[in-house]
Amino acid sequence: MSAERVTVKEKVLSANDQLAAETRARLEAERVFAVNLISSPGSGKTTLLECTVDLMKPSLRLGVMAGDVQTRNDADRLIRHGIPVEAIETGGGCHLDARQVSRADLLFIENVGNLVCPAGFDLGESVKVVLMSVTEGEDKPLKYPAAFKRAAALVLTKTDLVPHLEFSLERVIEYARSVNPDLTLFSTSSYTGDGLAEWTSWLAGQVAALKRAQESAKSARP
Amino acid sequence: MHELSLALQIREICERELEKLPESRLTALGVEVGAFSAVEVETLSFCLQVVMSERFDGVRCEVIRQPGTAACSSCGLQFEVTQAPFECPSCGALARGVSGGDSLQVSYIEVESER
């Protein structure tokens, strides 16, 4: 009788991660910059996307995949803006996984409104962006560190409501940076249009950077 | 998060590993769970006991918590963190970012064989 310990070191979500890696490679080869938008329900993902699409549609080819637990409401709102939209009804699921995500310059993946589970599932996106409305409370980054830790950018939404709230922008920034100092921050109001120019020019910069990287990789090949 | 389905995937990983080890009996497994993996450790431990005991008798399930590391924004001290707020134990200032603590993996299995 012998006993031994065998080192495994296999990720529990390795099946999802493998699919995500395939999706990421395919998107990069097609030069599609993919943004996985994560937030609580009602923080304004769809509204921000409607404004973003209207501003960026003239210069870039855009696409949206909208995940909802039930209904196609978000997808239907976005279709009216004249871009290709794919609705993903999860039927009770509280996040998207790589199996559900498979041509555009810029693809938005509107995840299911939830700050816990979507943080854990890699979809093969280029970046995760976390949204947070000013009515949600300043300590969201501390309550849901996984989502903020893995995001490249934080978009504060509904900033037109700040005068009616006890809300400290400085505190949110301090909390968010304590989790992730590399977060790029945007303060936006889809209602007034404040901050949308900064947000869309950052997105356009990311798209351009991906194209440059792909072109130089292509010219480097013999 | 989805601790029961994670437990089932962990069992699958163990079963695949056991296929490589003929005539071995699984006696224990270790799962590493990061503090920022959005997984509830108590729930995962409970679910693991339930799903593992369906197939394997008397398996010991160890859940190893993996903390993250934070750096103080004021004095620069590096310290381990498992939950927010990430305050420096030395000077009380908030951290300037947290790294690590994202792990979610089957770290090891232990087996007994008749050899």
Where are these regions (language model features)?
Chain B
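Short functional micro-motifs and their immediate structural scaffolds
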Residues: 80, 93-97
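Long, charged N-terminal interaction/targeting segments
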Residues: 1-57
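Long, charge-rich boundary regions
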Residues: 2, 20, 30, 104-115
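Cys/His-enriched microdomains
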Residues: 70, 86, 104
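Short linear interaction segments
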Residues: 100-101
